[in-house]
C-alpha cells in the first residue's frame, strides 16, 4: 500500500533536482522490451554492450530502419536508456570498453507492466490470496496473544505492511490491467464490426465470452477469500482497541479493509458494466442483421423488376382466410352481467387493502419477543408465517414480517462481519439470510 511521507513540494523539488524525465517512443520502448526479454533468459541478469547492440539490430530490422548507422544509433539508444535511469552501466579498469548493463528498478517496472502483468492467471491470483490469508491469520493470532511494542511491530505491523499490503496492491494492479484489456477488446470489436460485421460475429462472440469469463473468474476468486480476509482484519482491529499506543496498526488495518472493499466492489461493478456492453453489442448485431436482411430483399426485388424482359419470372402468392377477432376491445367488462354474484368465500379482496391490517397484526405478535427479551430467529418466524398463507402471497408476507422484525432491534452477530447462514422459509426453494435478532 503506497504511503508518501514527503509532501508535494518536497517531491517536486526532489524530481527537479535529480532531473528525472522519461521519453520512450515506440522504437525505444520496443528496444527496452527486447532487452528485458533477453535479460530474463540469463541467470546472472547481466548483459554486455554487444548483446544490447544485437537486440537493437532486431528492433531496427522490425521497424525497417537502415542498417548502415546501426552502431551509432544503438550507442545513442543505450546512452539514452542510461541517462533516463532505465539501465545501469558498470565499467571496469581491467576490461575497459566492455561495460556490463543491468536493468534498473524503473526499467523492470515498465517492462513488467508491458510483458508479465499482461497475462491474467487465476492460479497466480489464488496463490496470492492464499499467501495473504496465511499472513493475516498469523498476524491476527499474534495480535490476540498481545505483547510489547516490538512484538506488535515485528509480528503484526510488518507482515501487514510489507506482505499483505503489497499483494493487495498487486491485485489492484491486476484489476486495472483488466480495465485496459476491456477497452482494448471494445476497440477490437468496433474495428471488426466496421469492416465486415457478418464475418466478425464469431470473433466478437469469442472476445465477449472470453472477457466475461475472465472477469467472473477473477471476481469469484476474490469473493471466495474476501470473508476470511475481512474476519482476520476485524480480529486484529478488536485486539488494538484496548491499546492506546497502537494507532499505527489500527490505521493500517483500516486502510487494508478499505482497499479490500474497493477491490471486491470494483470487481462486481466491472462485471455489471461489461454485461451492459455485451447486451449493447448483441442488440447492434441483431439490428444490423434485420436491416441487412430487408436491404438484400429490396435489392433483389429491384434487380428482378429491371431485368424482367430479359429474364421473365412469375409471381405466385397465397392468400389465406383471415382470422377475425370478434371481441370488442372497447367493451367494458361488468361483473353483474358476465360473472354474476360470487359466494362470500370466493370474493376477491386486493392484498393492498389488507396490508396495513396484516402489518399491524404481525407487529403486535412480534412485539412479544421484545417484551420478553427473547432472541428472534427470522428464518423460523418467517417460515411459520408463510405456512399460513398461499404461495402467491409468500413474497409480500415475508417482506412485511422482515420489515416489522428489523424495527424491533439488531443482531449483534452483524458486527462481526461474518455472513449468516441461508435458511429455507418455504417448501418452494425460498431462503433468507439473517442473524438472530438479540439486541432490542
UniProtKB/Swiss-Prot annotation:
Similarity-based family: Belongs to the MukF family.
Role summary: Involved in chromosome condensation, segregation and cell cycle progression. May participate in facilitating chromosome segregation by condensation DNA from both sides of a centrally located replisome during cell division. Not required for mini-F plasmid partitioning. Probably acts via its interaction with MukB and MukE. Overexpression results in anucleate cells. It has a calcium binding activity.
MF terms (GO), sorted A to Z: calcium ion binding
Native source organism of the sequence: Salmonella typhi
Lineage summary: Bacteria, Pseudomonadati, Pseudomonadota, Gammaproteobacteria, Enterobacterales
GO biological process: cell division; chromosome condensation; chromosome segregation; DNA replication
Region named Leucine-zipper: 208-236
UniProt subunit comment: Interacts, and probably forms a ternary complex, with MukE and MukB via its C-terminal region. The complex formation is stimulated by calcium or magnesium. It is required for an interaction between MukE and MukB.
Cross-referenced CDD domains: MukF_C (cd16337), MukF_N (cd16335)
Protein known as: Chromosome partition protein MukF
HAMAP family: MukF
Amino acid at each position: 500500500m503506497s504511503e508518501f511521507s514527503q509532501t508535494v513540494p518536497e517531491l517536486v523539488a526532489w524530481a527537479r533536482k535529480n532531473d528525472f524525465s522519461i521519453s520512450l517512443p515506440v522504437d525505444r520502448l520496443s528496444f527496452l522490451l527486447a532487452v528485458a526479454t533477453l535479460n530474463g533468459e540469463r541467470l546472472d541478469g547481466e548483459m554486455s554492450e554487444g548483446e544490447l547492440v544485437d537486440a537493437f539490430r532486431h528492433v531496427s530490422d522490425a521497424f525497417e530502419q537502415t542498417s548502415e548507422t546501426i552502431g551509432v544509433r544503438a550507442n545513442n539508444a543505450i546512452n539514452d536508456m542510461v541517462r533516463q535511469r532505465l539501465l545501469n552501466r558498470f565499467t571496469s579498469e581491467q576490461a575497459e570498453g566492455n561495460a556490463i548493463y543491468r536493468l534498473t528498478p524503473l526499467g523492470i517496472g515498465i517492462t513488467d507492466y508491458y510483458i508479465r502483468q499482461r497475462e491474467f492467471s487465476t492460479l497466480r491470483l489464488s496463490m496470492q490470496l492464499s499467501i495473504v490469508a496465511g499472513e493475516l491469520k498469523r498476524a491476527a493470532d499474534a495480535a490476540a496473544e498481545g505483547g510489547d511494542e516490538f512484538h506488535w511491530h515485528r509480528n503484526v505491523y510488518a507482515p501487514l505492511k510489507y506482505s499483505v499490503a503489497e499483494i493487495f496492491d498487486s491485485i489492484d494492479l491486476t484489476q486495472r490491467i483488466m480495465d485496459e484489456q476491456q477497452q482494448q477488446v471494445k476497440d477490437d470489436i468496433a474495428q471488426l464490426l466496421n469492416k465486415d460485421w457478418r464475418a466478425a460475429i464469431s470473433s466478437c462472440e469469442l472476445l465477449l465470452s472470453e472477457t466475461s469469463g475472465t472477469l467472473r473468474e477473477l471476481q469469484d476468486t476474490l469473493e471466495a477469500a474476501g470473508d476470511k480476509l475481512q474476519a482476520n482484519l476485524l480480529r486484529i482491529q478488536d485486539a488494538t482497541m484496548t491499546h492506546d499506543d497502537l494507532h499505527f496498526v489500527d490505521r493500517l488495518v483500516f486502510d487494508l479493509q478499505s482497499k479490500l472493499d474497493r477491490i471486491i466492489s470494483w470487481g462486481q461493478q466491472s462485471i455489471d458494466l461489461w454485461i451492459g456492453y455485451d447486451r449493447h453489442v448483441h442488440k447492434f448485431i441483431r439490428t444490423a442483421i434485420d436491416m441487412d436482411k430487408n436491404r438484400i430483399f429490396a435489392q433483389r426485388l429491384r434487380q428482378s423488376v429491371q431485368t424482367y424482359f430479359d429474364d421473365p419470372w412469375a409471381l405466385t402468392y397465397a392468400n389465406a382466410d383471415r382470422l377475425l377477432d370478434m371481441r370488442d376491445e372497447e367493451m367494458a367488462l361488468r361483473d353483474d352481467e358476465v360473472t354474476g354474484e360470487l359466494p362470500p368465500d370466493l370474493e376477491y379482496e386486493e392484498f393492498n387493502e389488507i396490508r396495513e391490517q396484516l402489518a399491524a397484526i404481525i407487529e403486535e405478535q412480534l412485539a412479544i419477543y421484545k417484551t420478553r427479551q427473547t432472541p428472534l430467529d427470522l428464518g423460523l418466524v418467517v417460515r411459520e408465517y408463510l405456512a399460513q398463507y398461499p404461495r402467491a402471497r409468500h413474497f409480500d408476507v415475508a417482506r412485511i414480517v422482515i420489515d416489522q422484525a428489523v424495527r424491533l432491534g439488531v443482531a449483534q452477530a452483524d458486527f462481526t462481519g461474518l455472513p449468516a447462514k441461508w435458511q429455507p422459509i418455504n417448501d418452494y426453494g425460498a431462503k433468507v439470510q439473517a442473524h438472530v435478532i438479540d439486541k432490542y
